[in-house]
């Protein structure tokens, strides 16, 4: 296992694996190079997921109206009634017949 590790390290450093293997066989490797430092502790931040809104049709998104709770539609009138809404004053109501004073 140590030889495999030595070969991997040698390949990573760009040295000849044969020369490095011969060198490590004759001299013991220092312990500082083979020990690994403990990795730094990483903190994982969790994202806060919002609840997905209900899906709507595209037209409903574009033409959103601010509707009040159960608003009644006004009564529909004929077109002429809309145009002449304020012109009812020209007709005077019929006066009751004058009664002779006795």
Swiss-Prot record:
Residue positions assigned to the propeptide: 22-58
Record bears the keyword Endoplasmic reticulum: no
Biased composition range(s): Basic residues: 80-90
Predominant location: periplasm
PTM comment: Proteolytic processing gives rise to the active protein.
Localization per record: Periplasm
Biased composition (Low complexity): 22-41, 91-102
Keywords assigned: Periplasm, Signal
GO cellular-component term (any): periplasmic space
Pfam families found in the cross-reference section: Asr
Region (Disordered): 22-102
Signal peptide: 1-21
InterPro entries per the UniProt record, alphabetical: Acid_shock (IPR023497)
Keyword Signal annotated: yes
HAMAP family, per the entry: Asr (MF_00546)
NCBIfam families noted in UniProt: acid_shock_Asr
Function statement: Required for growth and/or survival at acidic conditions.
Assigned protein family: Belongs to the Asr family.
Entry protein name: Acid shock protein
Organism expressing this protein natively: Shigella flexneri
Gene coding for it: asr
